[in-house]
Amino acid sequence: MELYQKHLKDVYANFNKLAAVHGETTSNSVTFHVFQQLDSTNLTNYQLENVITQVKELDKGPKDYLYWVILGRCSAHLHVKMLDQLLEEAMIMSDNLHYWESIDKNWYSRVLFLIQSFPTRLYHICRNSIKSILQFQNFSNIFAKKNLFPKVSKSDVLLFPRDAFISQASLLSLIRHEYRGNAKRLRQLRDEHACKIGCLTRAIMSEGVSDAASSSGDKNGISAKADLKQVVSQWIQRLSQLQGQKIDNSESLPDILSITLDNLSHPTDEYFEAKAYFRPSAIERNWPKIFVTLLSAWLSTQIITKNRTSIRLWIDYLYSTAVDFYTNWIQKPILGIFDTIRSNRADSQITLLQTKSLESDMESLQRMVIDFVSDTSPAGINLDLVKQEVQQGDLTYVLQAYEHDLKTPIRTAVSGNLVRTLLIQLQKTKVDVEVALSGIDRLLKSQELVFATVGITPSLIFCYVIIRYVKANIFNNDTLSRAERRQRFRQSLRAAERILVRSQKMNSLDDMSYGLLVFQVNLMAIMSMDMGLSKDVAEDLLQDLEDIQSSSYGVQAQLRAVDRIYRLFKNSI
């Protein structure tokens, strides 16, 4: 997301205002037809080229007010396209600069870089040595350090004696000189791009067109047209100066626009120069991995050939283990969750009691108590009331008889009801246990979905960790992780704050500092797209980033915007 897009639309609106003020928008005119093609703020190069070609035809006739508005809008489009190109190239330079700076963090990275670049260095040694022998018949430069380290300057090489060439210290020192030199030159080229970025962004956000639009209503047609012509000429000349064009006096403004658009289809000269200082190619960086992989494959082939039977059994065992894991711990639990959702609780697989067990035992207890009361109590007792009391757990009649029989336990055990009352209480105990189990059973059935979900959670977590590891380390080597994006965001925010702090005394930014600030802000906007922010938080963050980029209110306001990001988004970045 380009944070300057809104300001660009304001520029277009001011050009439209200039056109509307003088009423030169006749629908039948060819000029107005060309003007209508510039309504979009996102034209392709092909569309813009067609418009410029038509403007060249208009340049041969009388130049009315709308003609200069068309030129202004074309130049504004080219400002955007040039700014996009410079930001993209600066981003690539910054990525390569970050690579060289990461090598300087530890000795392991330097040694690894030396190993990765060894084939290229060997190629330079062979080529330069053969050239030296064939042309000069000089054998003394075969092992010269300049052949092994072609990017290190001569003064750096002379700092080390020849007999220390093969020592580890001198090699690491030369490596350090090389990658620091690459980083230094990339930083210089990026700063040159930053100057152009600052100039373009300041022009897009300037009020020059707005002032011309506001003053055109107070002037006559000739004076207002002269003001607009001056603004448009400045915009077009700025494009040619930033591209380093050599303009002939015979070339018209549409010709300059055409040349500018044609140059935008090719990388800039600074980018071509920066390619010599880019990080090594993917093949050069990964050839140790490829070599180790091929060697491992060859050794594995030898081992497989010698131990074919045992390896086959091992593979079969791993395959069956993976299949069983998927079937028993992923597929079946997931299907069980769906069955739990669709099934009735009465059909639940989690149960402690059979469905009719408690009911039958309760009915048996009621019959035993009613029979006992009928046999031992006088007539006239309400048996339905006794049945209800038994269902509620009240065995008063049985317990009274039991207490009476305990007075003469031996006699009542032989000829009384002691044994009968004991058996009734035993049945009561069984019913009480089943009632408790029934309560636990209902609780388990109510939480069956929770148990099923908890049961499958470890398997899903295990699969998620494996898939994420494979995705992060095998398939997405060139994609920044979320943690890396947040780190790059914090680094860019720190760099933006340093730029503003250094310019705090002057309360303004020069073109290079402002361009670096714009670059860092756009980098933060790109990094924030995949940091896991919600839509509302992302919109608020982009507004604050736009406040950092805007220089309308001074450096202090920009620093407050940086502090606001630190304060409000510290948990998100």
UniProtKB/Swiss-Prot annotation:
Segments crossing the lipid bilayer: 447-467, 513-533
Bilayer topology: Multi-pass membrane protein
Pfam families: NCA2
Protein's GO biological process: mitochondrial mRNA processing
Assigned keywords, A-Z: Membrane, Mitochondrion, Transmembrane, Transmembrane helix
Superkingdom field: Eukaryota
InterPro entries associated with the record: NCA2
Subcellular localization: Mitochondrion membrane
Primary location recorded for the protein, binned into one broad class: mitochondrion
One GO CC term on file: mitochondrion
Similarity remark: Belongs to the NCA2 family.
Function, as annotated: Involved in the mitochondrial expression of subunits 6 and 8 of the F0-F1 ATP synthase.
This protein's name: Nuclear control of ATPase protein 2
Organism: Schizosaccharomyces pombe (strain 972 / ATCC 24843)
Lineage: Eukaryota, Fungi, Dikarya, Ascomycota, Taphrinomycotina
